Curated annotation (Swiss-Prot):
Assigned protein family: Belongs to the AaeX family.
Chain segments annotated as coiled-coil in the UniProt record: none
Pfam families assigned to the protein according to its UniProt record, in alphabetical order: DUF1656
GO CC aspect terms: plasma membrane
HAMAP family, per database record: AaeX (MF_01546)
Membrane topology: Multi-pass membrane protein
Protein name: Protein AaeX
Domain of life (superkingdom): Bacteria
């Protein structure tokens, strides 16, 4: 069970994972914006794959915090 309740907004029911996805997406955009000036993407073979893996790792960490 998740610590977050099911949210009902304007008659639409949102499961707790929806808010975890939004939080991890916001953290991903922030972290990506911080990593771009450092030049780490010059060492990455496939930037899109790196971004996907980064988002998945952030989502996993956020989900572990709320479970």
């Amino acid at each position: 069970m998740s610590l977050l309740p099911v949210m009902v907004i304007f008659g639409l029911s949102f499961p707790p994972i929806f808010f975890e996805l939004l939080l991890s997406l916001a953290l991903f955009f922030l972290l990506r914006r911080l990593l771009q000036p450092t030049g780490i993407y010059d060492f990455v073979w496939h930037p899109a794959l790196f971004n996907t893996a980064l988002y998945c790792c952030l989502f996993y960490l956020i989900t572990c915090l709320f479970v």
